[in-house]
């Protein structure tokens, strides 16, 4: 046995030795093999390279021997010690394995998730070098250097600031670096840059740029612009006055003032003659401009040269500037050619056509010469020959009368000249004796050829000659051809001459193709003809199917083809002879006709010549005497009116038919004596019976009007006031009027809404009608739904109480009519109320400008401004500070009563002015005069606006008023109105002006002794001195007087006819006797006349009613001013035609009357259509003029009789009796409100009747054919010699919990009460109120509504009006003023001693005296001031003011808020204890108020939920996800008493009920729930999360409404089946399937669908996604355990791993959500695996919670997961000593204090503010978790800014943009909030909280009213469209989603970007003092890691006005 063991040992030893030596043997084998291979290669190469004898160097031999020996010794040593070597190898392998495992563990250790990692931006810089200084300016300024960064690079606090570190210039230069924008850094030097210098910029990135910016280069170079010049224009100059003076001029332009000496030193000027190569030196002189920036080099005078030449300018390098610069480095050259003696040439010869004064064309020959020649010489030098028409030598050329041979210069010889005819040329008069262009008149046949000779005898003004004669061929152009119908229109009167007028030019004949329409086929005209009535074009069907064809041909006189030929064609011959069917409907086509050609030849030529432009016209014409007007009512019925075109009278007994497409007569009626018939709606007729026209027939006469609106026959009323609401088509239609009791409310107030409902006809019973009211906040979140049932009166009310944390802004109240089964609803009415922080006004301000002119103007010396300031308690506001701002905006006068008149002002200055006027103080009557001092401004017309503010006594709050007036220095103004367009008037057209004069009150006045000058504007050549010192002719616009005549303007105005006989640009100038220009009218006369007599003058019908409002049945008088005499139709219309009246007027002005129907209510429209009389000469205007004028019908018949009475004056604390008296049973609501509140709200008590009878639109559509009437041919021809012209949710965290207690608003609402006779309502007046109360009442009966108001003044013996800041911060020192008013009676003017005392609260201390004595007479007031300092105690601080005199006393208590200058923050520190002791240090130092300091520990991880629950409870936002997450801890209380919050179970149920109500309001029709409100496309995550919560709440024992869960389940089914395939959507689909399965639904198919999609699209990643565990849980619920366990495995493996890197998405899911959801689902559905859950799973969650990386959703999921885990794992029951919490004090000598020991599951205790650290002791073996919660306000602001993912900066400037640290009391300050995201998470869903300094209030940007009126009934409220922040002022670049305005802070919601966004708003100082500036705070609502906090910058000082 022993031998065997020894043998085995030896064997194993040998094996071990063999294994160890094997590597050595392997190495030796490889060495020998490589040696053998090398020898083999040598043998193979020996035959090629021969024998090589090489000996290794000595060092190599020694090295090889050494390595060989070492190798052998190693081999022997290993063979000797096999065991030691083996052990060492094993140890090395173990160490390597350990190192590898450690490295892997290090990589996969739990790593903290980086909060909002900063995104670094690699940016580049573009250097914008300074530009050259503009030395042309009066004060040249140094140009800045700009660095433009690609990204937003400036530190957010440095924008707009001067930079003093981080950047430098080399060489150094004095100046200033400043961030102009976030991307632009600008350097502005003190002096101009040296020109041409090189600079280097060095940048220190850390000091200069934002931390997220990285630069790719830190050194930049640039060069300043070098001194340089340019050789500009060079010319050969000839003196226009002395032609023999010639020289060359070179223009040199410099970019800086040139040094004259150095410049002239470098100039060389030489002359080269002909082709010579040598230069002759020329003398020169130089002319400079004033600034030495331009130089002109003049050569010596030059003589004419036979061969010409050139002048050469050379400027050498070395030219210097007179400023710091380097000299030029390059020479420059320029040449100017000198012409030779024989260089005169003819540039062009052309023949053209011009219009003569008599509309006829003339031919002209235009000759252009290269230099000016004398007119007499050119007259003799030019000759012309008319060459023959045919070339008889060319046999092949055609020789007919229409053929013209194309002669050219090669054909010209003596023989041809002998056959040619000399042509007479007449030289047109020349403007100057010498000129280069001339024109000659000539007369020659068209298309012929001229030969023009220009003799070489010409000598130019410069002495140059032509070398030889010039000959040129010129073609004679033909006159343009014209053939058109005259005038516009289609109707010829059957009783007129029936001639259609034609205008022709250059035509030998015309052909009129006449197609007469068969009457029975008229419907085809309407169906197939173009929709333009006058058009003869057919779209589809040929007109041959329904017409009879005729032709008319006639020759035209074309002896003078340039003249216009007028022709009339009598159409009466083509009428049928049958008097009962005249057939007067024609399609006319006008075309050219040649009398010399046969018809068939003309047809063939026309067909062949397709490219020739067609000359002709076409027209659709109806010969009829029947004019038609139709009016379509809102119910689609029609009223048809028929009128005689000839007489203008209504056509009685005419048959009116409605004709269908197929020609069938659908309806037919006979007109009555007023020419009227009525048809019902025609919509019932369809298809072939569709109506197409109204056909009117009478005694063989036929007319028609299409029924389609697509025709051009509808009248356009858009220029008239016809807008309004649509009249309901159903008389039973309901509408409601909603009104509030005061319009503005503080958060927490209750608002009352009255609702009055009526039907459209006021006749339908309202009893029992169900309505629904909805109240929505400014974010459109539904806050309440109230059912309402109407009674017979239709008068109801509702109330709603807002919360202290309700969002501020405009709330909306909607009233709906509920449909069947509540499925549909119709909006009946709507109103808005404003919820905001406000203080009631105490003053009433009236600003008056005298003399008062609502229209017109006031002369500056007459204008006075007075302000009246009264206390609202009825006494004058004495010694009140008044500030005023005067704004003058220049404007040309224009006045509403004269809208079409142009007034003129000879203005020389168009600058506006804005200035602060001197402050004033009111006198004993509360009055003050404001000096305007308008004398210092230029005489011009201005719009003056005066904005005045009256301040409260000693305070900064004010009440503003504005007034406006037009200011002009003139006694009268002259206005001019044209009857047509003045910019283009045809020659010889008639254009008239109406000239009026008005005084400042806009009364028309007479203005005698005026003159009217006609001036023509022409461009003429004027000899002008140039900058170079020489003279030249230049074209200048010159005004030349044409004529002048006296003018007298009458009181009614004067008409004047413009001169239009000559074309050109003219000005008509009206002057007074002193030559002052009163008006200038420019007009242009075109060269062509109105050949076709088209309509070119406006037709305007002016209507004026005698009243604005009428009683029912009253007669209306209409003053009608028409452009011509004629006949018309007046109708009263609205939704239908109510009545009508025909009239005739022989003059242009008349007064007509029509009566309103007795049953008509609301409003109506007077509609007048007026037709020109057939004998009128105004044929160049439209024959139809029309106008519409609205009128109002009195609501007196609907007014209920109600009276209201209240005492005029009472005292505070008394009861206000309000007596209401009615004449019948009425439902009445009485409400009384502080006038100061109503003044803030600008509340107007409107009359509900004005709403129900509001203006309705004109919905009647009018169509007609009367504007198509053609003038008679005889009338047209009679006027051709003088053709006419024309006329022409609670945000608790961001609210102030230390809010001061404010006095309740003085407002009373009685509720709706039945009153029949007399009833008294009593309202107890609060004892703190002094002021004016407006008392109002609204009453209603089924058929009447009443409105009445009065007022009562409340006034005590002593009235104290303290001015206290809304809030202050500890350390603030400020002044409080008290206005004291003595209202004691019977003092007889004697002053009495009154003691005023201030009792401060504990939070404040008085600095100085707390009591003052003053002497005050009756009805006088004065001011008392106290200085206070805020202590560190926080909260509401009531100040008590007492005033006493003898037995009389008065007390007033007003509170301020002492609140920290820091925002409220919650911080939770949590984690798992390492070992049995853990200490938490760095505790926050907080104010004790509202501070919560709590420490908790437990052996169960459920303790971590304590911190999460606190975080959720304090969370300030209310999206659907957030309110659901906040409710998760509440529903856990019933299961775990340790999680008790401050709410009991009843309060929890109430809170859950409110939350479910909000969720229900956000649920859409499919059941899906929106994030903020119901949306058709909601966030898909929200609905499944809400369902998960509902199921948890249900399992916790809370009852739920079934409808919300059922609806949400329906949305889940849609979500589960949604075909989206991205991973996020698939995760949500799996979530939805899980929730449906959890409720018992069989979801196998849907599960399989989701799983297969995941497997197909995401095979590598889906199994570890949350979608996998949702599917696994679903399969487990369906008892499919195998599939469930299979899907669980990949997720289970993930539980033990930590994340190697952080990740975040915006879709709610983060690493903590992943861990919590996995733990939650495994513990819920796989309980058997709970005991084996790896500790790393909990560790990952603890890590995220410890580092505060959680959101609302991840917090809620963590609570659910830990609760489920704790329920599955029984907690270890330990003794109390096993777990302790100890407080370690920061005070020395105090021993650590045990504040709590284990009690049940948790150990929990509160620690004090004296704690330095909290220590947790765990004496048990089980692990423990701890939580430390700290919530409150920090004592000190941070020293450094915080910018985690977001940057924020806040600065204060004055209104001019200058930074401020000291402001004047009442001054407005601009607050600039800048934000920028420096991480992706910091870009969305941000909340910015900006705390105001004490003593300031927010200014909301609402313009003050022009004036405050006592009688406010008719004042309309302005309504805006769309939400915009009421804070934002101009200059802001950030447009937030919403802003919440609180008393002490502004909260702004929106998004940021990586660029700086700026929001600017205003605050206003209200109290003097020294106030702490709080920091601005920002955070992301959905990512608590993203936070930003600016540094609070010291204090801001507010001083009295006189101390500034």
UniProtKB/Swiss-Prot annotation:
CDD domains (UniProt xref): A2M_like
Pfam families recorded: A2M, A2M_BRD, bMG10, bMG3, bMG5, bMG6, MG2
Stored InterPro entries: A2M_N_BRD, Alpha_2_Macroglob_MG3, Bact_A2M_MG5, Bact_A2M_MG6, Bact_MG10, Macroglobln_a2, MG2, Terpenoid_cyclase/PrenylTrfase
SMART domains: A2M, A2M_N_2
Keyword Disulfide bond: no
Signal peptide: 1-27
Entry superkingdom: Bacteria
Family from the record: Belongs to the protease inhibitor I39 (alpha-2-macroglobulin) family. Bacterial alpha-2-macroglobulin subfamily.
PANTHER family tied to this protein: ALPHA-2-MACROGLOBULIN HOMOLOG, UBIQUITIN DOMAIN-CONTAINING PROTEIN
Official protein name in the record: Alpha-2-macroglobulin homolog
Naturally occurring in which organism (per UniProt): Yersinia pestis
């Amino acid at each position: 046995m022993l031998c065997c063991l020894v043998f085995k040992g030896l064997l194993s030893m040998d094996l071990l030795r063999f294994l160890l030596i094997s590597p050595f043997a392997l190495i030796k084998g490889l060495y020998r093999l490589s040696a053998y291979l090398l020898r083999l290669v040598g043998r193979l190469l020996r035959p090629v390279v021969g024998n090589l004898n090489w000996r290794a160097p000595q060092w190599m031999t020694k090295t090889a021997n050494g390595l060989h020996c070492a190798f052998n010794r190693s081999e022997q040593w290993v063979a000797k010690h096999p065991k030691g070597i083996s052990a060492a190898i094993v140890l090395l392998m173990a160490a390597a394995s350990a190192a590898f495992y450690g490295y892997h563990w290090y990589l996969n250790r739990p790593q903290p998730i980086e909060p909002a990692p900063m995104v670094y931006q690699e940016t580049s810089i573009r250097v914008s070098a300074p530009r050259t200084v503009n030395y042309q300016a009066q004060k040249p300024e140094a140009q800045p250097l700009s660095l433009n960064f690609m990204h937003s690079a400036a530190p957010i606090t440095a924008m707009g600031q001067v930079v003093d570190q981080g950047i430098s210039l080399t060489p150094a230069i004095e100046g200033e670096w400043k961030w102009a924008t976030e991307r632009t850094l600008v350097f502005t030097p003190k002096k101009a840059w040296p020109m041409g210098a090189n600079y280097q910029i060095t940048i220190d990135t850390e000091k200069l740029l934002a931390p997220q910016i990285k630069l790719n280069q830190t050194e930049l170079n640039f060069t300043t612009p070098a001194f340089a010049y340019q050789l500009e224009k060079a010319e050969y100059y000839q003196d226009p006055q002395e032609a023999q003076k010639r020289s060359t001029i070179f223009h040199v332009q410099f970019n800086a003032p040139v040094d004259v000496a150095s410049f002239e030193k470098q100039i060389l000027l030489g002359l080269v003659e002909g082709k010579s190569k040598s230069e002759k030196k020329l003398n020169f002189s130089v002319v400079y401009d004033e600034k030495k920036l331009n130089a002109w080099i003049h050569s010596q005078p030059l003589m004419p040269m036979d061969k010409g030449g050139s002048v050469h300018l050379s400027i050498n390098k070395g030219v210097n500037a007179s400023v710091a610069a380097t000299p030029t480095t390059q020479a420059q050259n320029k040449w100017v050619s000198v012409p030779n003696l024989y260089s005169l040439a003819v540039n062009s010869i052309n023949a053209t056509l011009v219009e003569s004064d008599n509309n006829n064309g003339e031919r002209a020959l235009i000759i252009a010469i290269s230099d000016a020649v004398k007119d007499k010489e050119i007259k003799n030098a030019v000759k012309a020959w008319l060459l023959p028409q045919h070339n008889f030598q060319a046999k092949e050329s055609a020789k007919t009368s229409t053929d013209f041979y194309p002669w050219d210069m090669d054909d010209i010889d003596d023989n041809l000249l002998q056959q040619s005819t000399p042509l007479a040329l007449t030289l047109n008069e020349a403007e100057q004796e010498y000129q280069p262009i001339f024109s000659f008149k000539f007369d020659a046949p068209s298309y012929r050829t001229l030969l023009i000779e220009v003799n070489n005898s010409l000598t130019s003004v410069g002495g140059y000659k032509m070398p030889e004669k010039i000959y040129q061929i010129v073609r004679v152009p033909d006159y343009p051809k014209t053939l058109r119908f005259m005038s516009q229109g289609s109707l010829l009167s059957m009783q007129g001459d029936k001639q259609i007028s034609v205008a022709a030019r250059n035509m030998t004949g015309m052909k009129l193709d006449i197609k007469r329409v068969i009457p029975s086929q008229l419907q085809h005209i309407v169906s197939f003809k173009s929709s333009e009535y006058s058009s003869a074009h057919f779209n589809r069907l040929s007109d041959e199917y329904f017409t009879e064809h005729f032709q008319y041909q006639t020759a035209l006189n074309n002896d003078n083809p340039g003249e216009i030929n007028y022709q009339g064609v009598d159409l009466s011959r083509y009428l049928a002879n049958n008097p009962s069917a005249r057939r007067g409907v024609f399609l006319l086509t006008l075309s050219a006709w040649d009398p010399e050609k046969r018809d068939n030849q003309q047809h063939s030529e026309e067909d062949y010549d397709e490219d020739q432009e067609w000359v002709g016209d076409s027209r659709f014409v109806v010969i009829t005497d029947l004019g038609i007007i139709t009016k379509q009512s809102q119910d689609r019925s029609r009223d048809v009116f028929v009128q005689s075109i000839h007489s203008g009278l209504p056509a009685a007994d005419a048959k009116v038919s409605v004709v269908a497409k197929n020609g069938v007569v659908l309806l037919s009626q006979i007109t009555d004596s007023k020419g009227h018939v009525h048809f019902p709606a025609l919509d019932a007729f369809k298809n072939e019976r569709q109506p197409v026209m109204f056909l009117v027939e009478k005694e063989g006469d036929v007319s028609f009007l299409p029924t389609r609106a697509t025709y051009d026959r509808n009248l356009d009323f858009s220029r008239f006031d016809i807008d309004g609401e649509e009249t309901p088509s159903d008389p039973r239609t309901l509408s409601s009027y909603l009104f509030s009791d005061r319009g503005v409310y503080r958060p927490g107030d209750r608002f009352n809404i009255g609702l009055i409902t009526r039907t459209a006809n006021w006749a339908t019973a309202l009893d029992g009608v169900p309505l629904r009211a909805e109240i929505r906040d400014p974010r459109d979140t539904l806050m309440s739904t109230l059912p309402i049932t109407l009674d017979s009166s239709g008068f109801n009310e509702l109330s709603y109480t807002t919360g202290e944390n309700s969002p501020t802004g405009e709330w909306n109240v909607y009233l709906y009519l509920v449909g069947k089964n509540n499925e549909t609803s119709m909006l009946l009415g709507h109103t808005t109320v404003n919820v905001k922080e406000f203080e009631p006004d105490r003053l009433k301000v009236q600003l008056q400008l005298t003399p008062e002119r609502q229209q017109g103007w006031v002369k500056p010396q007459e204008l006075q401004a007075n302000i009246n300031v009264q206390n609202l308690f009825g006494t004058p506001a004495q010694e009140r500070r008044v500030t005023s701002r005067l704004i003058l905006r220049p404007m040309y006068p224009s006045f509403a009563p004269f809208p079409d008149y142009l007034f003129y002002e000879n203005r020389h200055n168009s600058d506006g002015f804005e200035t602060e006027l001197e402050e004033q103080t009111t006198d004993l009557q509360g009055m003050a005069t404001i000096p305007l001092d308008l004398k210092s401004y230029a005489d011009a017309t201005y719009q003056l606006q005066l904005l005045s503010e009256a301040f409260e006594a000693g305070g900064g709050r004010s009440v503003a008023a504005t007034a406006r007036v037009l200011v002009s220095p003139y006694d009268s103004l002259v206005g001019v109105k044209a009857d047509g367009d003045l910019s283009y008037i045809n020659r010889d057209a008639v254009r008239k002006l109406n000239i009026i004069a008005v005084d400042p009150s806009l009364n028309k006045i007479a203005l005698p002794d005026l003159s009217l000058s006609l001036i023509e504007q022409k461009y003429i050549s004027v000899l002008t001195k140039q900058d170079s010192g020489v003279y030249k002719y230049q074209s200048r616009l010159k005004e030349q007087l044409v004529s002048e005549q006296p003018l007298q303007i009458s009181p009614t105005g004067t008409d004047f006819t413009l001169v239009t006989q000559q074309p050109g640009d003219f000005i008509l100038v009206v002057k007074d006797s002193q030559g002052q220009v009163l008006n200038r009218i420019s007009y242009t006369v075109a060269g062509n006349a109105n050949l076709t007599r088209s309509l070119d003058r406006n037709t305007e019908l002016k209507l004026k009613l005698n009243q604005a409002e009428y009683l029912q049945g009253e007669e209306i008088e209409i003053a009608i001013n028409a452009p011509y005499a004629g006949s018309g139709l007046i109708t009263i219309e609205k939704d239908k035609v109510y009545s009508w009246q025909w009239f005739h007027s022989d003059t242009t002005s008349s007064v007509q009357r029509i009566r309103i129907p007795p049953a008509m209510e609301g409003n109506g429209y007077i509609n007048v259509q007026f037709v020109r009389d057939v004998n009128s000469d105004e044929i160049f205007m439209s024959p139809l003029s029309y106008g519409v004028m609205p009128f109002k019908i009195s609501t007196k018949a609907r007014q209920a009789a109600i009276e209201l009475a209240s005492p005029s004056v009472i005292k505070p604390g008394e009861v206000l009796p309000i007596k209401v008296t009615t004449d019948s049973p009425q439902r009445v609501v009485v409400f009384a409100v502080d006038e100061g509140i109503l003044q803030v709200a600008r509340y107007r008590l409107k009359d509900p009747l004005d709403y129900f009878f509001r203006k309705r639109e004109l919905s009647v559509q009018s169509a007609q054919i009367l504007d198509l009437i053609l003038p008679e041919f005889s009338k047209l021809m009679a006027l051709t010699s003088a053709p006419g012209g024309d006329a022409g949710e609670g945000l608790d965290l961001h609210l102030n919990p230390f809010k001061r207690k404010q006095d309740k608003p003085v407002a009373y609402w009685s509720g709706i009460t039945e009153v029949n006779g007399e009833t008294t309502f009593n309202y107890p007046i609060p004892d703190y109120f002094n002021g004016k109360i407006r008392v109002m009442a609204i009453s209603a009966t089924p058929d009447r509504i009443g409105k009445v108001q009065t007022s009562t003044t409340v006034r005590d013996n002593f009235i104290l009006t303290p001015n206290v800041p809304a809030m202050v911060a500890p350390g603030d020192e400020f002044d409080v003023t008290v206005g004291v008013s003595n209202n004691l009676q019977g003092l007889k003017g004697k002053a009495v001693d009154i003691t005023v005392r201030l009792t401060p609260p504990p939070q404040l201390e008085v600095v100085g005296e707390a009591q003052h004595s003053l002497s005050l007479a009756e009805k006088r007031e004065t001011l008392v001031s106290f200085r206070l300092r805020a202590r560190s105690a926080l909260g509401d601080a009531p100040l008590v003011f007492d005033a006493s005199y003898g037995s009389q006393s008065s007390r007033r208590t007003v509170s301020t808020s002492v609140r920290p200058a820091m925002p409220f923050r919650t911080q939770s520190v949590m984690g798992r204890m390492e070992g049995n002791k853990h200490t938490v240090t760095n505790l926050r130092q907080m104010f004790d108020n509202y501070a919560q300091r709590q420490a908790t520990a437990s052996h169960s991880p459920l303790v971590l939920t304590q911190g999460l629950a606190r975080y959720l409870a304090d969370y300030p936002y209310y999206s659907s996800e957030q309110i659901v997450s906040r409710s998760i801890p509440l529903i856990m209380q019933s299961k775990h008493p340790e999680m008790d919050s401050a709410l009991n179970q009843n309060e929890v149920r109430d809170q859950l009920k409110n939350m479910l109500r909000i969720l229900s309001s956000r649920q859409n029709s499919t059941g899906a729930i929106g994030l903020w409100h119901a949306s058709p496309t909601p966030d898909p995550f929200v609905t499944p999360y809400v369902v998960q919560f509902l199921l948890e709440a249900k399992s916790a024992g809370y009852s739920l409404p079934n409808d919300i869960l059922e609806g949400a389940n329906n949305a889940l089914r849609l979500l589960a089946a949604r075909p989206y395939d991205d991973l996020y959507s698939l995760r949500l689909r799996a979530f939805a399937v899980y929730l449906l399965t959890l409720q018992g639904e069989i979801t196998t198919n849907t599960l399989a669908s989701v799983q297969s999609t995941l497997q197909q699209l995401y095979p590598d990643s889906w199994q570890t996604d949350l979608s996998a565990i949702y599917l696994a849980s679903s399969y487990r619920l369906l008892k499919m355990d195998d599939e469930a366990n299979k899907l669980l495995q990949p997720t289970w493996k993930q539980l033990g791993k930590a994340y190697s890197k952080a990740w975040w998405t915006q879709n709610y899911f983060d690493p903590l959500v992943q861990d919590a959801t996995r733990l939650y689902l495994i513990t819920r559905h796989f309980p058997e695996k709970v005991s084996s859950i790896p500790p790393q799973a909990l560790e990952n969650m603890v890590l995220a919670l410890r580092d505060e990386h959680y959101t609302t959703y991840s917090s809620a999921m963590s609570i659910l997961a830990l609760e489920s885990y704790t329920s599955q794992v029984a907690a270890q029951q330990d003794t109390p000593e096993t777990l302790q919490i100890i407080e370690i004090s920061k005070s020395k000598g105090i021993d650590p204090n045990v504040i709590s020991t284990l009690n049940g599951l948790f150990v929990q205790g509160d620690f004090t503010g004296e704690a330095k650290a909290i220590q947790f002791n765990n004496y048990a073996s089980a692990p423990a978790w701890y939580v430390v919660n700290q919530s409150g306000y920090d004592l000190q602001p941070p020293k450094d800014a915080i910018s985690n993912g977001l940057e924020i900066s806040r600065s204060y400037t004055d209104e001019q943009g200058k930074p401020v640290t000291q402001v004047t009391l009442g001054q407005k300050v601009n607050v600039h909030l800048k934000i920028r995201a420096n991480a992706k998470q910091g870009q969305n869903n941000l909340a910015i909280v900006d705390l105001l300094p004490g003593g300031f209030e927010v200014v909301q940007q609402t313009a003050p009213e022009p004036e405050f009126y006592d009688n406010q009934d008719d004042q309309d409220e302005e309504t805006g469209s769309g939400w915009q922040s009421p804070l934002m002022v101009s200059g802001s670049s950030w447009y937030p989603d919403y802003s919440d305005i609180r008393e002490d802070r502004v909260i702004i919601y929106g998004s940021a970007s990586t660029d700086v966004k700026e929001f600017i708003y205003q605050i206003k100082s209200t109290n003097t003092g020294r106030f702490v500036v709080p920091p601005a705070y920002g955070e992301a609502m959905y990512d608590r890691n993203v936070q930003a906090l600016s540094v609070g910058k010291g204090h801001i000082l507010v001083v009295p006005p006189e101390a500034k």
